[in-house]
């Protein structure tokens, strides 16, 4: 056992980790995410790198937060929270490029008490492929 392992736990690969995480909440399809944000029922949070946003465009109305700042910006108790981080009952839909990093990010938000956090199946690429709004 390594110094970082918990007794009784075994290391897992990223695919297994994602599978485990994704069983703890319902992920959202692009059209459902669009409808929820238009209705004011969810906050869409784009965690893609600036280079990807520059290359592919932005989702109108999405809060852009770099992945390495996500927890600090969305923690309702944090001193660096975004104005949109209104409480632990906030429904957050995290968007990355293809829907992988966003699953890990949503799980991290759950640990902060944002239990309605989820992510977008297929990420930004699925959003764009569905013909949903993108700005340059």
What are the roles of these predicted feature ranges?
Residues 45:
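Active-site flanking residues adjacent to catalytic metal/cofactor-binding acidic residues
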């Amino acid at each position: 056992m390594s110094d970082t392992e918990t007794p009784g736990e075994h290391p897992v690969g990223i695919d297994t980790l994602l599978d485990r995480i994704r069983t703890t909440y319902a992920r959202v399809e692009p059209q459902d995410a669009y409808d929820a944000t238009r209705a004011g029922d969810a906050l869409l949070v784009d965690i893609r790198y600036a280079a990807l946003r520059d290359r592919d465009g932005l989702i109108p109305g999405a809060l852009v937060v770099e992945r390495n700042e996500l927890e600090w910006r969305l923690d309702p108790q944090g001193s660096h929270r975004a104005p949109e981080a209104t409480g632990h009952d906030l429904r957050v839909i995290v968007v990355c490029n293809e829907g992988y990093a966003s699953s890990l990010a949503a799980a991290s938000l759950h640990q902060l008490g944002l239990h309605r956090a989820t992510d977008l199946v297929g990420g930004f690429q699925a959003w764009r492929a569905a013909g949903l709004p993108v700005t340059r």
